[in-house]
């Protein structure tokens, strides 16, 4: 079991530095079988610049949580605030959402897909492409700007999708299982890539994943949700300094203990 000192690398989230806040949030849906409550009484805080991982069973409301943050939904009860933005319309201006699928447009090249985020903000296509272009070299995609999505590997497509998420410059990113569709080797490579990308472009991040090891490697803190309706069962602080190395993390005993703890909570 981690000592208090080992588990306290990340400072507690104070009100003054909170970037994301959910208080008593409940969200339900009407289905043919009646009402389904996705999350109920959900409370979470995320500090400015913190990466929060969220894990939990399938159907526990993880994607609903991200859609609430990104302003794609409103809660039935409770409050959701992102950098002070309390309404869905306001949250859409400060939170960028990356869904599970890359959703690249097949008729646009990679640069055009990344630049689409800027075009949607009113920039002319040429200017948007000029602003997006420098990221391709930084993110290991130099010489692939003109490639269509069908010519890109799964990892490359996810990098383009991440650039599209990053380019609007919003302070908060909501990432919904960005590597779920990738094979194991590519997924491991992309975990290291994302860790490096977030080190170079720090943002407040809420990352949903089914992979406990992925959550621990990428996050400063991990929230474990219950089965539906989703509630926070535990919050685990990750005592791993940045920058992070995926190969070293595999051998880290503190992370191994945290993984066991997370799995215990999920199995309870």
Summary of predicted features, one role per range:
Residues 7, 20, 78-90, 131:
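Conserved ABC transporter NBD signature motif
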Residues 15-22, 28-41:
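A short, flexible loop at the N-terminus of ABC-type nucleotide-binding domains that lies
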Residues 55-57:
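The feature captures the beta-strand-to-loop junction immediately N-terminal to the Walker
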Residues 70:
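Helix-to-loop junction immediately C-terminal to a conserved catalytic motif
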Residues 115, 119, 126-144, 196:
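Conserved ABC ATPase "signature" region
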Residues 148-152, 156:
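Conserved ABC ATPase signature
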Residues 167-171:
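A short, proline-enriched helix->beta-strand linker immediately N-terminal to the Walker B motif
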């Amino acid at each position: 079991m981690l000592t208090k000192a080992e588990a306290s690398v990340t400072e507690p989230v104070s009100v003054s530095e909170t970037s994301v806040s959910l208080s008593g949030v409940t969200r339900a849906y009407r289905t043919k079988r009646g009402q389904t409550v996705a999350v109920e009484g959900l409370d979470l805080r995320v500090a400015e610049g913190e990466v929060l991982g969220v894990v939990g069973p399938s159907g526990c409301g993880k994607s609903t949580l991200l859609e609430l943050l990104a302003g794609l939904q409103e809660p039935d009860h409770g409050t959701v605030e992102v950098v002070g933005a309390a309404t869905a319309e306001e949250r859409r201006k400060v939170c960028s959402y990356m869904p599970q699928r890359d959703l690249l447009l097949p008729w646009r090249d990679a640069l055009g897909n990344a630049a689409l985020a800027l075009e949607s903000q009113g920039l002319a296509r040429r200017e948007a492409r000029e602003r997006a272009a420098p990221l391709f070299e930084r993110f290991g995609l130099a010489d692939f700007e003109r490639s269509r999505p069908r010519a890109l590997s799964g990892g490359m497509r996810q990098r383009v999708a991440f650039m599209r998420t990053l380019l609007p410059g919003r302070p908060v990113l909501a990432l919904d299982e960005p590597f779920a569709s990738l094979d194991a080797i590519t997924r491991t490579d992309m975990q290291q890539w994302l860790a490096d990308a977030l080190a170079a472009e720090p943002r407040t991040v809420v990352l949903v994943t089914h992979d406990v090891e992925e959550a621990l490697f990428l996050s400063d803190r991990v929230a474990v949700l219950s089965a539906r309706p989703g509630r926070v069962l535990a919050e685990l602080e990750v005592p791993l300094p940045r920058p992070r190395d995926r190969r070293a993390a595999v051998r880290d005993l503190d992370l191994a203990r945290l993984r066991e703890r997370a799995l215990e909570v999920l199995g309870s």
